[in-house]
Regions:
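Short helix-loop "hinge" at the ATP-lid/N-box region of the Bergerat-fold HATPase_c
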Residues: 16-17
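Short beta-strand/loop element within the Bergerat-fold HATPase_c
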Residues: 23-35
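Acidic ATP/Mg2+-coordinating residue in the GHKL
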Residues: 43
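Short conserved segment of the HATPase_c
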Residues: 48-60
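Glycine-rich ATP-lid/hinge loop adjacent to the conserved G-boxes
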Residues: 61-71, 100-101
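Short alpha-helical Gxxx[C/S/T] motif in the catalytic ATP-binding
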Residues: 76, 80
Length: 118
């Protein structure tokens, strides 16, 4: 089971790469918070439609603009969620915005956070 966590991070980073254009930045960082470690993957792609933020973790969810970003089976994030939860962790997605109060603005990219117990 431990080796499967690598699959999660490879999937999240691969997704970030597929949604960015040549030369765009992808950030990966780790922070310890209380009894968890947070692993954060951020991209500078188009972000995620607000109504899709929870749906992206459903099996075969495909109502994303994959046609312009390459093929997608709709399984990667669902499998990642199962693996993270099997380790007692959580995973979520959010959009990066200029400020937290600026909900109406266009996203500056997407952020995926994996929280795992330490």
């Amino acid at each position: 089971l431990e080796g499967r966590l690598a699959q999660v991070f490879v999937n999240l980073i691969s997704n970030a790469i597929s949604f960015c254009e040549e030369g765009d930045a992808i950030r990966v960082w780790v922070r310890k918070r209380e009894n968890r470690v947070l692993v954060v993957i951020e991209d500078t792609g188009p972000g995620i439609p607000e109504d899709a933020l929870q749906k992206v973790f459903q099996r075969f969810y495909s109502e994303r603009p994959e046609t312009q970003f390459g093929d997608n089976s709709g399984l990667g994030l669902a499998i990642s969620k199962q693996i993270v939860e099997a380790h007692g962790g959580v995973i979520w997605a959010e959009n990066i915005r200029p400020t937290d109060a600026d909900i109406g603005s266009e996203p500056l990219g997407a952020r995926f956070v994996v929280g795992l117990p330490v």
